[in-house]
Regions:
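Catalytic "initiation/cleavage/transfer" segments centered on a nucleophilic residue
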Residues: 1-29, 118-207
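Intrinsically disordered, low-complexity Ser/Thr/Pro/Gly-rich regulatory segments
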Residues: 2, 44-47, 107, 188
């Protein structure tokens, strides 16, 4: 089934599944931080001369990304729980949804929402390879998934403007923030930038 918006036709199933991911996050983490993130493949793979660093742009890259990010979050939790002021209960279960899309030039990219416990992670932070900020962990997880060296720019990961949503059902602004988030979700569920029939999935989410 489909529905329509300013972006054209959309896939209803994708929207329903993404809503469930958000609900699951709120059920476990009443204070949830939801991020919109874009992951891009390298544009000019032929410029990477070292054969050991040829990008792994197969369909499993997105699964490697989520696995790498989970591992980084677990490692960050382990480090923080060594501190007396960081309770072990302040964990963050990663929940996510992604869609695969292609540009007019045939370049693959992914749009995602990533859900975190706001009590553990409130800020996205800077891209700093010396610190375990959310931005650093997300960006380096994608480079790891592609099997290429991490660079100082992190340019293959994009953080859209106003892409952070802080949700708590008890806050007065919950309905408006949730509505704004679902408008961003509509952009992810549009039909026109999806490729069907190539054997690879266009959608995936946490369970």
């Amino acid at each position: 089934m489909t529905y329509d918006s300013e972006f054209g036709s959309h896939i209803s199933l994708y929207r329903d599944r993404i809503k469930q991911v958000i609900e699951d996050s709120l059920n476990e983490h009443p204070n949830s931080m939801i991020l919109r993130v874009d992951l891009h493949d390298p544009i000019d793979t032929e410029e990477i001369d070292n054969p050991f660093f040829q990008p792994r742009v197969d369909s499993a890259a997105i699964s490697r990304f989520t696995s790498a990010l989970k591992a980084k979050l677990e490692h960050d939790k382990h480090i923080k729980t060594q501190r007396k002021d960081w309770p072990d209960t302040r964990h963050s279960t990663l929940r996510y949804a992604w869609v695969r899309e292609y540009t007019k030039n045939g370049k693959r990219h992914y749009h995602l929402i990533l859900c975190f416990n706001q009590d553990a992670y409130y800020h996205v932070g800077d891209y700093d390879l010396n610190r375990n900020t959310i931005r650093t962990m997300i960006t380096t997880a994608w480079y790891s998934a592609l099997g290429i060296p991490i660079d100082s720019s992190g340019k293959l990961v994009n953080y859209p403007p106003n892409g952070k949503y802080l949700l708590n059902r008890k806050r007065d602004n919950f309905e408006q923030t949730y509505s704004d988030l679902m408008n961003r979700v509509d952009y992810m569920t549009k039909v026109r930038t999806k490729i069907v029939g190539d054997g690879d999935r266009n959608f995936g989410c946490s369970r």
